[in-house]
Amino acid sequence: MEMDSHNAKPLRILLSNDDGVHAQGIHALADELRSIAEVTIVAPDRNRSGASNSLTLEQPLRVTEIAPKTFSVQGTPTDCVHFALNELMKDDLPDLVLSGINHGANLGDDVLYSGTVAAAMEGHFLGVQAIAFSLVGKQHFESAAKIARQLVEQHLIRPIPTNRLLNVNVPDLPFEELGEIEVTRLGARHHAENMIKQRDPRGHDIYWLGPPGKEQDAGIGTDFYAIEHGFVSITPLQVDLTAHESLRAMDSWLKEEN
């Protein structure tokens, strides 16, 4: 394991995800990073895709160490990182929180629903540099893992120049076929398609969420555009959802006489 030259201590990385502790993506990421870092996995006990930033509030979290430095949590991705940073690793916080590798894209509006992004966001909330990784497919996890290692190694030489959360999407291609890493903004989708109504065996109506909406804003500079053209997309995200440009207009609107 290589050492962090700044403090002569091993680089320490916390991994989480929303696909579950047994998912292929998180283990591909761990395998790639273990030669340069001390890796701890804290991830949900099952698939929690779409959990966003939800926390478990009405019941306790049950945590099981299923392998050395690998913990399964009966909770959401945000629960996992919250537990790891506020309990498991509280006396010696990790240097990085990495989430993923997600089994599918997190582009545009996807980030609002993504448990993968939420896990990284919780790390950011709690003061640790965090990056979310997603593979736009389910085959070439080793490509995304190599991109992750590349970014981590670059961070060790020149720290990431922002305290923003980073969202990385990697095309589902062999590593040697990937384009360059492009800094992008989030694109946008049309709203999701209609719900799918079915009947269960007992005659009750059941509903499935429809497919995600098609791309609405996928122009040059967006994450959608980068992926479509074979580039790796990296998007800095901020947690502040305030629409600052609307503050003055809203203030004037409220003060207008009817």
Curated annotation (Swiss-Prot):
Q: Does the keyword Cytoplasm apply?
A: yes
Q: Supply the EC number(s).
A: 3.1.3.5
Q: Which InterPro entries does UniProt cross-reference here?
A: SurE, SurE-like_Pase/nucleotidase, SurE-like_sf
| Chain segments annotated as transmembrane | none
Record note on cofactor: Binds 1 divalent metal cation per subunit.
Keyword Metal-binding in the entry? The reply is yes
A cellular-component GO term for this protein: cytoplasm
Q: Where in the cell is it found?
A: Cytoplasm
Reaction it catalyzes: a ribonucleoside 5'-phosphate + H2O = a ribonucleoside + phosphate
- Family listed: Belongs to the SurE nucleotidase family.
- Name of protein: 5'-nucleotidase SurE
**Organism in which the protein naturally occurs:** Vibrio campbellii (strain ATCC BAA-1116)
Provide the gene name from the record.
Answer: surE
